[in-house]
């Protein structure tokens, strides 16, 4: 139910097929463009929302995302907000082995509003999103510095946790580090309640 490249399934809340790396980034730009056009056409009392996305190192390394990012700035899509999970890891290893791009400088040169935060601090995330929402003249990139596989004792900050299972023993130690005492696939009732509420809002 959680493929690496999600495909259209409105019952699961998946509105679009995003395809390979970078395509989801470009699709988000298209969604933000649609919001801008429809809001201007029918008025912001009818159409008025933000477009959010979480993007990866791999997404931003693709040429497709660069072209879309330039257009987003050119079109002034100020209600587009992306959080960049900046963990410096790709499926092949450290990103700095294959890329020299400073994403902050690149996006600023395009005309995006760029913020840098600690990706593990929820208060910084909330503050950055609110700052981005307050600036509707530019698309926003929030660079959230993070550690992939955090709390995994042997695979933290490695490509070994990128798209691969931790393994039984590693998962056991990972859960111990999180002080997780419930069964692996058991989650608090509050989690189910929250998602059930959100799913009820989806119109199929």
State each model region's role.
Residues 73-81:
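Boundary/activation segment at the start of structured domains
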Residues 54-55, 59-63, 81-83, 87-202:
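Conserved acidic/glycine
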Residues 10-12, 22, 38, 42-44, ...:
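General N-terminal targeting signals
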Residues 1-74:
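Cofactor-binding active-site loop characterized by glycine-rich and histidine/acidic residues
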Residues 47-49, 76-77, 135-138:
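Short, well-ordered loop/turn elements at secondary-structure boundaries
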């Amino acid at each position: 139910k959680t493929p690496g490249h999600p495909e259209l399934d409105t019952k699961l809340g998946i509105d679009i097929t995003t395809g390979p790396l970078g395509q989801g980034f470009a699709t988000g730009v298209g969604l933000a463009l649609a919001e801008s056009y429809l809001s201007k056409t029918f008025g912001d009392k009818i159409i008025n929302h933000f477009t959010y996305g979480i993007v990866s190192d791999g997404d931003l390394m693709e040429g497709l995302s660069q072209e879309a990012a330039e257009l987003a700035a050119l079109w002034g899509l100020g209600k587009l907000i992306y959080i960049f999970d900046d963990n410096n890891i790709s499926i092949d290893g450290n990103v700095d082995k294959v890329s020299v791009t400073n994403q902050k400088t690149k996006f600023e040169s395009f005309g995006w509003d760029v913020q840098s935060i600690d990706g593990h601090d929820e208060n910084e995330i909330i503050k950055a999103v609110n700052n981005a929402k307050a600036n509707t003249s530019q698309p926003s990139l929030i660079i959230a510095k993070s550690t992939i596989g955090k709390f995994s004792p042997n695979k933290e900050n490695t490509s070994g946790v990128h798209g691969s299972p931790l393994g039984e023993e590693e998962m056991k130690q990972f859960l111990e580090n999180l002080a997780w005492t419930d069964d692996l696939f058991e989650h608090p009732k509050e989690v189910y309640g929250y998602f059930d509420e959100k799913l009820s809002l989806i119109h199929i």
